[in-house]
Amino acid sequence: MAKVDVVERVTEIIAEVGAPLGIELVDLEYKREGRDMVVRVFLEKREGGINLDDCAEVSRQLSDILDVEDFMPERYTLEVSSPGICRPLKKVVDYERFMGHLIKVKTFEMLPDEAGNKRKTFTGKLTGIADGVIGIDLTEGQHARVPLDKVAKAHLEFEF
């Protein structure tokens, strides 16, 4: 099974397993580390936050299904955890949910802030999302508008 198919099927299984528990997939990594592949799953709960027991339950059920379906093309290690305090932002609903939070965005290409300075990294308060563009009040006092299709990576930043 191709890598994209593995990711798609694991995503489907997590949705099936997580839904009754109120658990959603935040991010999924499937990549080579050393000689083995790693399936790294990051989960969250909309209500009350995810805990170790939740992660263990999803891990157990996911592992059982992966064993039964036996579609993984090679040996792998399964890791299931919360996304942590620097949670990635992947979907529009993530940006909507974390409005007003400090974020860091890295783009595929250089983009201008409101002063015309070009950069690939934007750090500041998320102020909005509309029409596929996120607004950020930068820590330097400027404002930036970043199209979602230009975002390579985005995540929450820890605020001291």
Curated annotation (Swiss-Prot):
Keywords, in A-Z order: Cytoplasm, Ribosome biogenesis
Gene3D superfamilies: Ribosome maturation factor RimP, C-terminal domain, RimP-like superfamily, N-terminal
GO BP term, pick one: translation
The keyword Cytoplasm is annotated on this UniProt entry: yes
Function text: Required for maturation of 30S ribosomal subunits.
Family of the protein in this entry: Belongs to the RimP family.
NCBIfam families the UniProt entry points to: PRK14647.1
Protein name stated in the entry: Ribosome maturation factor RimP
Organism the protein comes from: Geobacter sp. (strain M21)
Gene that encodes the chain: rimP
